[in-house]
């Protein structure tokens, strides 16, 4: 049971770190290549 509570307390921290890293990566990518994220359908 101790492992479960430890996992439940660290999972939100890991998810927030991963989301922050992904958002930062997308922001930097969009800053250098602003037209590559949105591909036109045509």
UniProtKB/Swiss-Prot annotation:
Membrane topology recorded in Swiss-Prot or TrEMBL: Single-pass membrane protein
Keyword Signal: no
Matching Gene3D superfamilies: Single helix bin
Transmembrane portions of the chain: 7-27
GO cellular component, one term: plasma membrane-derived thylakoid membrane
Top-rank lineage group of the source organism: Bacteria
UniProt KW keywords: Membrane, Photosynthesis, Photosystem I, Thylakoid, Transmembrane, Transmembrane helix
BP terms from Gene Ontology: photosynthesis
Principal subcellular localisation of the protein: membrane
Cellular localization per UniProt: Cellular thylakoid membrane
Pfam families xref list: PSI_PsaJ
Family of the protein in this entry: Belongs to the PsaJ family.
Functional summary from the UniProt entry: May help in the organization of the PsaE and PsaF subunits.
Protein name as it appears in the record: Photosystem I reaction center subunit IX
């Amino acid at each position: 049971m101790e492992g479960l509570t430890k996992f439940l307390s660290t999972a939100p921290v890991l998810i927030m770190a991963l989301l922050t890293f992904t958002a930062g990566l997308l922001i930097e990518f969009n800053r250098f290549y602003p037209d590559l994220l949105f591909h036109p359908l045509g």
